Design a protein with these regions (language model features):
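Substrate-binding clefts and substrate-entry loops adjacent to catalytic sites
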Residues: 89-96, 114-125
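Bacterial N-terminal signal peptides
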Residues: 5-14
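A metal-dependent hydrolase signature that marks the N-terminal structural subdomain at the beginning
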Residues: 15-72
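Post-HExxH zinc-binding segment in Zn-dependent metallohydrolases
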Residues: 125-159
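Soluble non-cytosolic domains of exported or imported proteins
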Residues: 22-26, 96-105, 124-132
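Short, low-complexity, Pro/Ser/Thr/Gly-rich segments in the mature regions of secreted, periplasmic
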Residues: 157-175
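Active-site recognition of the HExxH zinc-binding catalytic motif
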Residues: 104-117
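Active-site scaffold of zinc-dependent metalloenzymes
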Residues: 65-99
């Protein structure tokens, strides 16, 4: 009797783990496998990141901790490799659309998760360089999944945000 009660009470908790989180039918595990299948990166069995939703203000405060809050901060998410955590804005940001918003941000941040654990952070010349593959794989995911093409990245924006300032730079949280 006690065993049955425990199973009934604990079974729903099994589906709270990020690997089982519903991202339009995709699991974190299947998304990481897709990244590996479509890139030069390898997954080494590292624990999957914790995934949380935050207000856009919280996201921006984390990325820019010493800056004054400002309304034009439009960061949709970030991967914190020190805490193995992905935060995604809980509302659609200005330059994205609603169609599969959370899923699209998640695939981008999972690219950074895989990059970090595959050693790409050490190989990259600068942090912005890490965004090249993240944006490219994000756009490929959008195409393959039939997501609204308005969700794709503006090519000029990608060029601008992936340029290294001086070829060097600290590798911190990526977004």
């Amino acid at each position: 009797m006690l065993r049955t009660l425990l199973i009934i009470l604990l079974l729903p908790l099994a589906f709270c783990h990020p690997v089982n989180a519903d991202h339009k039918g995709h699991t974190v595990e299947s998304m990481v496998q897709w990244i590996v299948d479509n890139s030069r990166y390898e997954y080494h069995g590292d624990p999957y990141p914790n995934i949380v939703l935050e207000s856009p203000q919280q996201v921006c405060e984390t990325i820019y901790p010493n800056a004054e809050p400002h309304a034009d901060c439009n960061i949709a998410g970030y991967y914190d490799h020190e805490q193995n955590r992905i935060a995604i804005a809980d509302v659609v940001t200005e330059y994205m659309v609603e169609d599969h918003f959370t899923e699209v941000v998640l695939i981008h941040e999972l690219v950074h998760f895989v990059q970090y654990h595959d050693g790409e952070y050490e190989r990259a010349k600068c942090m912005p360089e890490l965004e090249i593959d993240a944006f490219g794989l994000q756009d490929q995911w959008i195409d393959e999944q039939g997501i609204d093409p308005e969700q794709k990245n503006d090519p000029l924006f990608v060029v601008f945000v992936t340029m290294c300032q001086d070829g060097h730079g600290p590798i911190g949280n990526t977004h």
